[in-house]
Amino acid sequence: MPTVSMRDMLQAGVHFGHQTRYWNPKMGKYIFGARNKIHIINLEHTVPAFNEALAIVKQLGSQKKKVLFVGTKRAAQKSIKEQAERSNMPFVSHRWLGGMLTNYKTIRASIRRYRELETQSQDGTFEKLTKKEALVRTRIMEKLEKSIGGIKDMGGLPDALFIIDVEHERIAIQEANKLGIPVIGVVDTNSDPAGVDYVIPGNDDAIRAIKLYATAVADACIEGAADSASVPNKDEFVEEKAADAE
């Protein structure tokens, strides 16, 4: 199972929190102290919390369940998109659309529209249109790609959310909470951990730290999926048993 060590976290700067004046008292138990008016996160809490989260993600992957990667702030966008795609998981790396979970019916209609436009752009339909109409459709498609391209293959609500910066993604957390979808979240010293089922106390601004989290979660998804592929399904097992009996 993929695990992340304290050394990995130190090298990525996971232990650096926010300025002491911006702290959230609810994060007090995860703070080791302060240096140069910056809170230092106690990695003795972070390491086991993150590795527990990875075990849960791996289990979800082995059950062919979907983990939605969410990170829409600039520092998180690249890692979230790359690692979600690598692990064949859905993602939101631009703006979170209100109702993305709680009003999934409407989102599904937008996904259908996006797929139609995608097909039209590939099958020559756009070439038969006027330049103006083709441009209008291309712009709509690009806009949809940005907002829902990462969830077009999700096929329904996700089974868990993995979030970078819970303060920035508060709407996503509220929607997940309403629907009983578990939330795994990286929570910095300035954030409120309320609504996060699996709190990972850590730096949510440093690109290296974000890459570390996203890569490890993607690795756990991939390992889980590999475990799932290596376990024969019940029908195959019954067939093999019958063949042996003959």
From Swiss-Prot:
<dbReference type="GO" id="GO:0022627">
    <property type="term" value="C:cytosolic small ribosomal subunit"/>
</dbReference>
<comment type="similarity">
    <text>Belongs to the universal ribosomal protein uS2 family.</text>
</comment>
<dbReference type="GO" id="GO:0003735">
    <property type="term" value="F:structural constituent of ribosome"/>
</dbReference>
<dbReference type="InterPro" id="IPR001865">
    <property type="entry name" value="Ribosomal_uS2"/>
</dbReference>
<dbReference type="GO" id="GO:0006412">
    <property type="term" value="P:translation"/>
</dbReference>
<dbReference type="Pfam" id="PF00318">
    <property type="entry name" value="Ribosomal_S2"/>
</dbReference>
<keyword id="KW-0687">Ribonucleoprotein</keyword>
<keyword id="KW-0689">Ribosomal protein</keyword>
<dbReference type="InterPro" id="IPR023591">
    <property type="entry name" value="Ribosomal_uS2_flav_dom_sf"/>
</dbReference>
<dbReference type="InterPro" id="IPR005706">
    <property type="entry name" value="Ribosomal_uS2_bac/mit/plastid"/>
</dbReference>
<protein>
    <recommendedName>
        <fullName>Small ribosomal subunit protein uS2</fullName>
    </recommendedName>
</protein>
<dbReference type="InterPro" id="IPR018130">
    <property type="entry name" value="Ribosomal_uS2_CS"/>
</dbReference>
